[in-house]
Design a protein with these regions (language model features):
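Glycine-enriched loop-and-adjacent helix/strand subsegments that border the catalytic/binding cleft
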Residues: 2-148
Length: 148
């Protein structure tokens, strides 16, 4: 992985549902109307199966996700040409400290060394109905579907 990972928070229904009540209160007063972006810089990336350097005394969250791997430089790409830039997909783990606000960039929560294990890039023809499972130390922890 050569560059920065750009990611979208709340990108499946279960994440949005957890925050629904908070989004009705100040300072939000409504759910986000556009994508909530965050980054994972290069220092966060480690290989699949490598140990995650957990900060001592901190609660850590883990969320499996699908990474779309852009294979060549892209600027102002037309929607109908976008597939030409996709090198493939990989499973990734969005490791982070708990977040308390979507108004502040999650730098301290998401950008720590080793906080983005990522698997091998594979070719997929359709990512619209994949079930993603998270296991922590061999035990089921979460699952969700890309359709959601």
């Amino acid at each position: 992985m050569k560059g920065t990972i750009f990611a979208v928070a709340l990108n499946h229904r279960s994440q949005l549902d957890v925050w629904q009540e908070a989004f009705q209160q100040s300072p939000y007063k409504a759910p986000p109307k556009t994508a909530v972006w965050f980054i994972k810089p290069r220092n966060t990336v480690i290989g699949c199966g490598e140990p995650i350097p957990f900060p001592q005394g901190e609660k850590v969250l883990s969320g499996a996700t699908v990474a779309l791997i852009v294979g060549k430089t892209a600027t102002k790409v037309r929607e109908e040409d976008a597939a030409e830039y996709i090198a493939g997909y990989a499973l990734a783990n969005d490791v982070s400290l708990p977040e308390e606000s979507f108004y502040r960039p999650a730098i301290k929560a998401k950008c720590r060394d080793g906080f983005c294990p990522i698997g091998e890039t594979v070719a997929l023809s359709n990512v619209d109905n994949l079930t993603i499972y998270t296991e922590i130390n061999g035990r089921p922890a979460d699952h969700w579907n890309t359709f959601d």
